[in-house]
Amino acid sequence: ASLPGIVNELDLSGTALGWLDRGSEITGANLQEGDVLIGLPSSGVHSNGLSLVRSVVDHCDASWDDIAPFSVEDGRVERFRQGELTLGEIFLNPTRIYCDPIVDLIQKGPCDASHIHAICHVTGGGLSNLLRLHDSLGWHIDSPLPVLEEFSWIQEMGSIEIREMYRTFNMGMGMVIAVSEEVSESVLEWVSGRVPGSAIVGKVTDNGRVVTHLDPAVRFDTY
């Protein structure tokens, strides 16, 4: 783990393993131009980029107990106290775990698992994680999920360039699934029933190993 400012002597970590039948691995090897990208919304920062968050909060001379100077969607943040939402509650909102819907999609979803060509966790590295899934194909995000309010606040308060935001944070999209175009609508309907707010966000391209975005400033060709 890379946790500057927090871990000085002890780093305690854990590992979880999953398995598939031999030959049914989803590695990205079956990706092809035109595959549809389905984005699953995040619940917040997902425990990534917190060093930058702390830096911005300190720079603003704010406190984690301060009432958030922005509003968030009702019910998105898990509450542990009464009253108005604080910055601490928002930035420590538990990470959404996609294990159950993803495993169910593979095992009993609306299409054969062979149509699921890649799955990407948008974690540290942001959208550049997509580059890890194929050596030559690219990814174009032309309909990004809505940016969560806390990310907009961090960008404004920290005067952070949009590309750096998408490299550091998930920006509201915690996972991407790449599926065959012919099953994309049925998969989207199925996934949306389990992770509300999911949407088609783009396609796999054949314009080189690069991630491009609706905002031309957001572009990655290295991880």
Question: Each predicted region: which residue ranges?
Answer:
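Glycine-rich anion-binding loops of enzyme active sites
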Residues: 1-53, 203, 214-215
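Phosphate-handling active-site elements
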Residues: 24-27, 62-65, 140-141
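Ubiquitous "structural anchor" signal
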Residues: 26, 31, 57, 132-133, ...
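Glycine-/charge-enriched secondary-structure boundary and capping motifs
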Residues: 5-10, 80-223
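Acidic, glycine-rich loop-and-beta core segments that form the ion-binding/anion-interacting portion
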Residues: 33-90
